[in-house]
């Protein structure tokens, strides 16, 4: 049974509930996930399926992947990814119909990259005084002590690269499933920018 799928983040909109209230939702387009290989605990040490998704020209596919698609007699796919803990058969297609309204899902993707940022933007630090000649408007302040401990502790929040990391938002509600358009509407925002690849997994699976 398919409990997870790869999708593409499209845009945010709003949906109206039965009581007339509007809630913000993110529309995820589920391109058909074709199972190209099955991993078993006996042979591979874990249970998983490899799926291919995303349209691509045949000339853009390397030879090993082209051989896989030719053997399965399916059009080339841009991405080959694994879904752990999911069972299936080679050639099976996983789509939006694996979910239904009311399900709770975890959505994982890479967050938007923000580049090198300071502590105010990266960690939400409060700023310093902006008047009376202060030069410490957005400075992080003291980061260590003097003679003891005479070092900076590990984990100290400091300026650095922000974003572009794997983020999972848990327990989002599936508001609507449109099997004809291969769309899943989930309540709230999900990581990543427009057209980002996201993994949707049922909560508790």
Curated annotation (Swiss-Prot):
Entry superkingdom: Bacteria
Entry keywords, A to Z: Ribonucleoprotein, Ribosomal protein, RNA-binding, rRNA-binding
What do the Gene Ontology cellular component annotations say? cytosolic large ribosomal subunit
Q: Which GO terms describe its biological process?
A: translation
Q: What segment(s) does the record annotate as region Disordered?
A: 128-150
Under the GO molecular function aspect, what terms does this record hold? rRNA binding; structural constituent of ribosome
The cross-references to Pfam families, in alphabetical order and at most eight, read:
Ribosomal_L3 (PF00297)
Q: What PANTHER family does UniProt report for this protein, alphabetically?
A: 50S RIBOSOMAL PROTEIN L3, LARGE RIBOSOMAL SUBUNIT PROTEIN UL3C
Share what the entry says about its subunit structure, partners included. Part of the 50S ribosomal subunit. Forms a cluster with proteins L14 and L19.
Sum up the protein's function in the record's words. One of the primary rRNA binding proteins, it binds directly near the 3'-end of the 23S rRNA, where it nucleates assembly of the 50S subunit.
Q: Which family does it belong to?
A: Belongs to the universal ribosomal protein uL3 family.
Under which name does UniProt file this protein? Answer: Large ribosomal subunit protein uL3
